[in-house]
Amino acid sequence: VTVTTTDAQGIYQMRVKRNAPFVFVSVPAEYEIPVENGMPKIYKKIAMGDNDVVQRSFKLERTGKKERFTLLALADVQIGRDDEVTMLDEEVLPLLIPYVQQELEAPVYGISLGDLVWDNMPFHSVYKEQIRKIGVPVFQVIGNHDHNKAITVDADADASFEAAFGPTYYSYNIGDCHFIVLDDVLYPGSSSYTADITDEQMAWLEQDL
């Protein structure tokens, strides 16, 4: 795990492990959170061999440090059936979207605090299509029900979440706040899991801070 900073021209170099799936940027407070198709996009996928050199760039827009912002917190959306998607689409979002757009002080940033789906991995993409309708960047946190319990290797159990939303741990900055997102679920398969944080994440966190 490696954390680095750019030089004055925004150039960075770093060594990464062969199996590292992503490189991501901890967006500085003076820059806007990059968005792609309505969702935060602070990461790039990487796939490389032992001696490969790859280039991944991030285009950030300097907007100045925000003195005030509103944080919208969601939790346990937990869609797992078509009727639950219908409820989210036709009952919940029609109430939430006007509230966010008309009542909350801009700029608004969201965070969804885990269990985006209910043990139904294909619904991650469905959830993504629904949540982007809110119209503000919403960061995602992985929950125990976002792990594929049919897979017995914890890192592989994250694959559906990562395909939809990117890394399971990362950080970003808004105003005077440094936000840290971690995956605190060790999921070896079946219905059981352990609440813990991997050594890899702790090593990254030490560098991040």
Predicted segments with their positions:
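Short Pro-Gly-centered beta-turn/loop motif in secreted/extracellular proteins
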Residues: Q13-F24
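Short, acidic Ser/Thr/Gly-rich low-complexity loop/linker segments typical of extracellular
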Residues: V1-I11, R15
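Residue-level marker for the onset of beta-strands and adjacent loop->beta junctions
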Residues: G10, V54, P167-T168
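N-terminal active-site segment of His-dependent metallophosphoesterases
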Residues: V35-H124
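N-terminal secretion/transport leader regions
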Residues: V25-S26, F58
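Residue-level detector of beta-strand structural context in well-folded domains
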Residues: T2, R56, Y169-Y170
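Extended active-site neighborhood of metal-dependent phosphoesterases/phosphodiesterases
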Residues: A29-E36, I42-I46, M121-D208
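Short, solvent-exposed loop/turn elements at domain surfaces
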Residues: T4, F24, I79-V85, P188-S190
